[in-house]
């Protein structure tokens, strides 16, 4: 199978679907389309997946015609009132040792497992480390090699209901398309430093590229089978 030349982004919001195609080599926007439609029932509480399926099929054909390349995977940006922001602080006794990456990795993993255990109906889209706290002193970024007795982190988790995630996965699987990553539109809107002149798909690409240095970046599930610890090293390195 030949190497893909393009990254595809879809964005579903309350009134439109936006499509964008980016050149993988230079990140240039090669194709962009906005389409107005009504995707929700019941005052934005329930998605009309039957209507989405028809629009999606037409959109995929347009993209493949434009790029002369089959669409096999995409990045998906979604606006939904069902998104949730959960926050948690976790602590460890660092015994006066220097802070290393593994300490932060352990705490993030601990926080993640607690969130998943108590919210089994949710899937995590974004993990943001808001603060690292060393002996009651806050830091926005990991202060490596500083000594402390007490180390804690404040973490925010942006989540979608698992059934919503599964419904979108099912929708795209009918076109034999894998969703590489879900991105929450409400989360994008909270970032003051993101380029407001860009369209939503471009802003979503900035998220994927790591514009928020406090966000833990994970590897797509279908490739690079690495454990959670190893995946977090991509963030803490």
Task: Outline where the language-model segments fall.
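Nucleotide/phosphate-binding catalytic cleft detector across ATP-hydrolyzing
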Residues: 1-14, 24-30, 35-70, 78-237
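Short N-terminal binding/cap micro-motifs at the start of the first secondary-structure element
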Residues: 16-19
């Amino acid at each position: 199978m030949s190497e893909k030349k393009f990254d595809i982004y879809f964005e579903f919001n309350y009134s439109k679907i936006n499509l964008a195609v980016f050149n993988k080599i230079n990140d240039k926007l090669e194709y962009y389309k906005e389409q107005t439609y009504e995707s929700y029932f019941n005052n934005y509480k329930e998605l009309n997946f039957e209507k989405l399926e028809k629009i999606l099929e037409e959109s995929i054909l347009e993209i493949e015609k434009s790029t002369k390349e089959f669409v096999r995977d995409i990045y998906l940006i979604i606006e939904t009132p069902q998104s949730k922001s959960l926050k948690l602080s976790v602590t460890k006794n660092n015994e006066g040792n220097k802070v290393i990456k593994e300490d932060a990795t352990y705490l993030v993993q601990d926080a993640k497992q607690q969130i998943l255990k108590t919210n089994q109906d949710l899937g995590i889209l974004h993990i943001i480390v808001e603060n690292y706290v060393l002996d009651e002193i806050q830091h926005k970024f990991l202060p490596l090699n500083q000594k402390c007795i007490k180390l804690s982190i404040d973490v925010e988790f942006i989540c979608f209901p698992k059934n919503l995630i599964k419904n979108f996965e099912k929708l795209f699987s009918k076109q034999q398309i894998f969703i590489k990553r879900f991105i929450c539109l409400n989360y994008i809107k909270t970032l003051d430093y993101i380029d407001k002149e860009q369209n939503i798909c471009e802003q979503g690409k900035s998220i994927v590229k790591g514009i928020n240095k406090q966000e833990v970046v994970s590897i797509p599930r279908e490739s690079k089978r690495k454990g959670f610890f190893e995946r977090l090293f991509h963030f803490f390195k």
